[in-house]
Amino acid sequence: MGNNKKVCLIIVDGWGIGRNDHTNPIFLYKTPFLDHLKQNYPYYALQTSGIASGLKYLEEGSSEVGHLILGSGKVIYQAKTRIDQSISNGEFLKNKILLEAINHSKNNNSTLHLIGLIGSNETIASKEHLVSLIYLARANGFNNICVHLISDGKDGPKNEILEIIENLNKESTTLGSINIASITGRFYALNEHSEMYIDKFFKFLISNNQNQQEIQYLTELKTKSISDEFIEPFAIKNIFKPISSNDSVIFFNLKPNSFPIEYLANKLLQKETNISNLKITSLVDLNQKIKSVY
């Protein structure tokens, strides 16, 4: 007879090993079943961050990273780690796919649009990658850049976008102006559940009829208790340019096969949009239509 023993892997998302004090709700509440398992069966801890998860030392993990490692049964270096390494060793500045995207706008005298999330939690996108993209473009003699920031407010503090932008400008003095062209909350730009909100972001990006504001408009939103996640798309006066024919777009988010980004990219490429000769690139894989870098 065959071996009829069964194994069941149950992933309790968000559950972890914490301190035995008031900061740990798992410790404060009764968990008799799990206590029984610990008392009667062997167990051990898994590290869900840093090098063990294919990230930088001490870097915070995420559910996407954890599920990938568990499913593969081995450490897979995340896109962020690979990109960070390429920036450190100089390979990023020689990347053919990125240079193609920049030269497309350069040769067509058009605009390079950089689109991605920005926040203190860098599991979805990285400020360093954004700065490196701007540096790469300017190192190749191209300055016509529009940065479309997606504010977080979900995986990080609720109102940090203005502070992050101020710090970004301070840290990037050698680059000159970052050219922030628009800001949109992730509820609209990265909504996993409703295409309607992504459509609003899409129409915003291709239209000239915008809610035009100064960057300090973010202070007004904060006083109204509007968190970064729910900021409706607004354009920065005198900087915003809509995505148009002959332009180039680089998405710098790090989540592969992201539905919102893939949906947005596909919308931009539709014939009905009437945007021709548009070049779209992503740092990570979206689909077979879009060139990916890593």
What does each model-found stretch correspond to?
Residues 2-8, 16-187, 276-294:
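Active-site nucleophile/metal-coordination loop of metallo-enzymes that catalyze phosphate/sulfate
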Residues 21-22, 29-32, 53-54, 97-100, ...:
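Short alpha-helical segments and helix-capping/turn motifs at coil-helix boundaries
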Residues 29, 93, 128, 196, ...:
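Short coil/turn linker and secondary-structure boundary residues
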